[in-house]
Amino acid sequence: MPYKENKLRQLGKSSISATDIASQFWCEKQMELNYLYGKKYTEQMRKGRQIHETLQAETFIPLTVEPVTYADYMYKVGYEDYMALKTLDEKGVCRELQIYGSLNGYRIVGKIDELRKEKESTRIIELKTIEANARIAAFDEAKMKLHTVQIMLYKRLLDSIKNREYTLYNFAKSYGIESLKLSDTFLRGLHTIGIKEEFANIGEIYRMVFDAISALPPISEKLELRYIDRFSGKQASSIIINYSEEKINSQLKFALGYWNGDREALPVSEEEKWKCKLCKFYGKECKVWWNGD
């Protein structure tokens, strides 16, 4: 356990995100350096976030009351999850669903871009923004690998909640939900917008979230990666991925080796050192493949 605690503490983290794990399959060293030195919020990221927010607003209006404390924040996430799941039931689609889980004792958190109800199943869709007119084969293939890891992990986490392997009890114990109390300021805000007293309760809101996920139709083995043109906001392409339990288990075993402290963060291989010129740490904090150019 000390290795686990030290690695998370070193990066200033209390949990591992699905994005962290996926990023290990682009460049594990870059993922680590982003936490050690700070991740730059780029214009591309801003546009991507804008697209996600626009799509979310098409299904429901996020909670407008701003959180003051950690408890308030957790309630806001739970409330928006519940509203997203309600739209899945009513409209057949939900967006921006935050989910939780556990792997080898680590807290795992991820945000599913979209769920869609099909005839007898629920499909997971991951949205990624791209520059449609500036595509390079090697770049696309490398990005596809990490996107595939991410969406397979989402299915694993969602299945775990649906099948009651990761329960409300597990979640509440891990995040200390029972001891959390909403701030008076936040509660007043909830009452102002008409949220009833019985729903202004953090334990109750997550009970409804976990019950709603458990009631979902089976999660489809067909996972969809949908690529959106960053500038127009229109769909550029769509790829169906077949879920593989064997493959995701192997990938998670590799990824957790880093978090367990079994090895240091790995740089890219020589075959993929072209990625380095896309990295802000190249030639500065990381000189693995730097030749002084």
Residue ranges and their predicted role:
Residues A18, G48-E53, T148-M152, K273-K277:
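Non-catalytic, well-ordered alpha-helical scaffold segments
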Residues E58, P62, I161-E165, D262:
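Solvent-exposed amphipathic alpha-helical surface segments
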Residues P67-A71, Y169-S174, E264-W274:
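Short, flexible loop/turn segments with low-complexity composition
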Residues S15, E141-K145, E270:
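Short, solvent-exposed segments of well-ordered alpha helices
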Residues M1-I124, R135-A137, Y175, N291:
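Metal-dependent nuclease catalytic cores that hydrolyze phosphodiester bonds in DNA/RNA
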Residues M1-R9, L88, I239-Y243, K253, ...:
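Long, low-complexity, compositionally biased intrinsically disordered regions
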Residues E90-V93, L97-L252:
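Mg2+/Mn2+-dependent nuclease catalytic core
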Residues N6, D20-Y35, N249-D293:
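Cysteine-cluster motifs in flexible loop/terminal segments that predominantly coordinate metals
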